């Protein structure tokens, strides 16, 4: 990838003055809204605390000493109010800040708070051996690099275990998914997953049925195989895909985003990047002020990674010459 293209995405210094000004203005507006929401929550909390004290005084006068009822009631009201305010704030953040971030990043990218990425799409990647019961996706960014379209979205896959008091929700994946759509098909299906996990899951639960249809690939890079396991229905194509340059790129991505996985199937490349935070929401009511740098944040880095993958795969013409 040339130096000029590698610095196009995600560098605020490359934005023109108008784009920087619009982004800074949006951040200032959201910071003001955060302060207002914080003030409203404090006000409602104070009012609820005062009402709880009055109710408890009445209860005390009637011989009731247990304060849990007024405290619990006040807590529920404050929680519901704060949740409503938080959701409204995030909706505003997406409409004003995220849309301007996507526009500022360029390349004709577009943003939608919804995503068309389905549970079937998630399962078809074959990157997670655990059973998935529920899937949700949102915040989809679409762009184009050369002749390749790509999208980046936020997704969450979960399942429920146990029953009664032991019932709990297990998060299988939460984070970003980058999808690169080429106008050419892969002959097989190749997946790249963390090496340690594949050994643990394979030993405890056995491989998923879709994973059993793939063979473990042996590659020439000892460093790469120490970090990742590669399964494929087409051993030769897997080796064509995972060139030294591609393996170096994946290892670099893994250093920045531990747990990154990749799937090569049909005409698409999928990259999953786990995270505990939503990149398209306000970080918190009591955190640092939102700046253009924070707003662009990891989204710009993920876009940059997607475009580097596109460049690397586009150069490897032998991958496609067999189709």
For each feature predicted by the language model, list its residue ranges.
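Hydrophobic alpha-helical transmembrane segments
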Residues: 57-76
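Transmembrane alpha-helical segments and their cytosolic interface motifs
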Residues: 35-53
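Charged, low-complexity intrinsically disordered regions
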Residues: 7-12, 39, 43, 99, ...
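Membrane-interface amphipathic/juxtamembrane segments adjacent to transmembrane helices
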Residues: 86-114
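Cytosolic juxtamembrane N-terminal segments of multi-pass membrane proteins
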Residues: 2-39
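Transmembrane alpha-helices and immediately adjacent membrane-cytoplasm interface residues
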Residues: 71-95
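Alpha-helical transmembrane segments
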Residues: 48-56, 76-83
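Exposed alpha-helical structural elements
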Residues: 18, 22-25, 29, 88, ...
